[in-house]
């Protein structure tokens, strides 16, 4: 760059540097002349005035401990460079392995078991069963439960003008809570009750309840409190003399028992359906349980939401799933040959039932907000078409048929709807018959709080299949901690309650023919009115 001519910028920069150096040199000379600081001394020279050298201080003695501490230490090196895994990584790996093991254990616990079970293999707690012992109106405020506040009372009965209706109201309202034990002491299942049924026997009330984790509870309500306990009821300090009722808890399923039924012609067999994708048959005489239907692979997850059987056929099972399927299976033939399935909805079917006297008709309730009526005689697998459908404002929880051809539904739009297909001539319809939207409108709509929330089982109507009078009636749980009973025309017949009911008896069921009503709660406890 020596031969190159400097630019104007470079010339100016060099001039500034030279000017700054000259200024600094002048300032230094001026400061020395007035004695602000002495001039620099040659290396090794002492100031002129310091003739005597200063005495050096004696070297400080260093203790052995300090010397050891001052010794050179090994150079720090990271665990990564030394080939050692970091503690956080080891802990994370152990935590991941632990979580994976827990998930696998939970998956295995929830996977259905296809084996046949004996009583000892199913028994969780309580008394061992034997075949001999086994057989022998309106909620005004939407979404707000008002515990113990009645919406139907004796005043409503007194105001009734219809003689038959008044007599039935008096009869149903006269049902009393089973007083041998308070409801909060009758814990039939460990977890929340999802399904219940009575044994069809009229000799004694025998109740079955299924819970969230696949437990099956059994209660014989013909038992009486021991005399020793009855005489000590008033002695609060002597709890040992007041035993709980005799209950039995079994575990035939690994997941929620969603539905159960006993065919009247086979009273010794209880059928249970579960979210573990299986339907099992429990022989009440032999106290054994066998799998009657399930998908081919245990890895297939097809939760079953409903189960029913035709009155004239004790060999055929009908069910619905949370995937929107409807199935039929004849237990006398191999499952792979006779199990038939239809996809009836894109969303889950929460409940269904067959028309008892004409079981080729059935009604479904779906999350897609519809209640649909179907005819098995004209049900295509490729594109099934319903006889008719009615759409509610919100999802429909259940659709229950009675022997008179009426369907009762419960819906999240806070209503109970009754569709009277019997009055429309359903018994004489030919295959292919269809109903218009106008014909599918409900005949009766009753306001009812159905906002169960997360912890209460969904409210579902359940008819008495063989009522003792010509008036049809069904029961359903009430969020105010009652069980309501309605007639087929929508008239409220009773509101059953009592002392000691501390939770909503959400799962309510009628005995087939006797005026016995049971209600199950989220804590696994039951109430019984007789």
Curated annotation (Swiss-Prot):
List the biased-composition ranges (Acidic residues): 233-244
The molecular function GO annotations come to: DNA binding
- Name the source organism: Aspergillus terreus (strain NIH 2624 / FGSC A1156)
State what protein this is by name.
Answer: DNA damage-binding protein cmr1
Which GO biological process entries does UniProt record here? DNA damage response; regulation of DNA damage checkpoint
Q: What does this protein do?
A: DNA-binding protein that binds to both single- and double-stranded DNA. Binds preferentially to UV-damaged DNA. May be involved in DNA-metabolic processes.
Q: Which Gene3D superfamilies match?
A: YVTN repeat-like/Quinoprotein amine dehydrogenase
Give UniProt keywords alphabetically: DNA damage, DNA-binding, Repeat, WD repeat
